[in-house]
Amino acid sequence: MPLRVKLDKNDLSKNTASVKFTDKPYLVANKIIKSLEFNATSLYRCIKKNKLRSENFSVQLSRRLLRTKKTLVLPSHVNITLISNSYDVILSWFIPALGIKIDCVXGRATHHTFYCDSVGFYYGQCAEICGRYHHHMPIKLCILPFEHFLIWWQHFGLPKLLFTESKNRFETDYGLKKFCW
């Protein structure tokens, strides 16, 4: 049985036409579907709202995926040398906005120099699945102007464990808590 559609030309907007289902659609017992009315503007608004909801959902999801417990704070307009090493697995520290990809190999120290000329927050991830829970290792980097960085430096200072020799090789990792936000 074909579905009959009744067009309502008495709509206030000139470019839209209301559509009312006047016959039984696919579900016979559903009175709500029988009495549905659509016009182009309300349909467009509905699509627009759903699109905004999906965009907001994806932004919220991406924020959750990039959330970190600590933030590395660095100054801008300064050459920064990063010395990295690993004890157990190969790591690949990747921040695409800065063009930085640093590979850490177990038992070796790698040196990388980079320069940040713009202030802001930068996000990255571990670029390789290199061990347990490394499929999602977010990185948050805060680049501050040099004057603001000096104020931050005076407030937080260097971690005490950087100046002491540690018998436990993993103790220095926990010493960086004060250095990061």
Swiss-Prot record:
Cofactor(s) recorded in Swiss-Prot or TrEMBL: Cu cation
Biological process, per Gene Ontology: ATP synthesis coupled electron transport
Swiss-Prot/TrEMBL catalytic activity: 4 Fe(II)-[cytochrome c] + O2 + 8 H(+)(in) = 4 Fe(III)-[cytochrome c] + 2 H2O + 4 H(+)(out)
Subcellular localization: Mitochondrion inner membrane
The keyword Mitochondrion is assigned to this record: yes
A cellular component annotation (GO) from this entry: mitochondrial inner membrane
Position of the signal peptide: none
EC number, as in UniProt: 7.1.1.9
Top EC class, one word: translocase
Predominant location: mitochondrion
Cofactor binding remark: Binds a dinuclear copper A center per subunit.
Binding site for Cu cation A1: C126, C130, M137
Keyword Cell membrane included in the entry's annotation: no
UniProt keyword terms in alphabetical order: Copper, Electron transport, Magnesium, Membrane, Metal-binding, Mitochondrion, Mitochondrion inner membrane, Respiratory chain, Translocase, Transport
Chain sites annotated for binding Cu cation A2: C126, E128, C130, H134
The organism's place on the tree of life at top rank: Eukaryota
InterPro entries: CcO_II, CcO_II-like_C, Cupredoxin
GO molecular function: copper ion binding; cytochrome-c oxidase activity
Function summary: Component of the cytochrome c oxidase, the last enzyme in the mitochondrial electron transport chain which drives oxidative phosphorylation. The respiratory chain contains 3 multisubunit complexes succinate dehydrogenase (complex II, CII), ubiquinol-cytochrome c oxidoreductase (cytochrome b-c1 complex, complex III, CIII) and cytochrome c oxidase (complex IV, CIV), that cooperate to transfer electrons derived from NADH and succinate to molecular oxygen, creating an electrochemical gradient over the inner membrane that drives transmembrane transport and the ATP synthase.
Subunit structure: Component of the cytochrome c oxidase (complex IV, CIV), a multisubunit enzyme composed of a catalytic core of 3 subunits and several supernumerary subunits. The complex exists as a monomer or a dimer and forms supercomplexes (SCs) in the inner mitochondrial membrane with ubiquinol-cytochrome c oxidoreductase (cytochrome b-c1 complex, complex III, CIII).
The protein, known as: Cytochrome c oxidase subunit 2
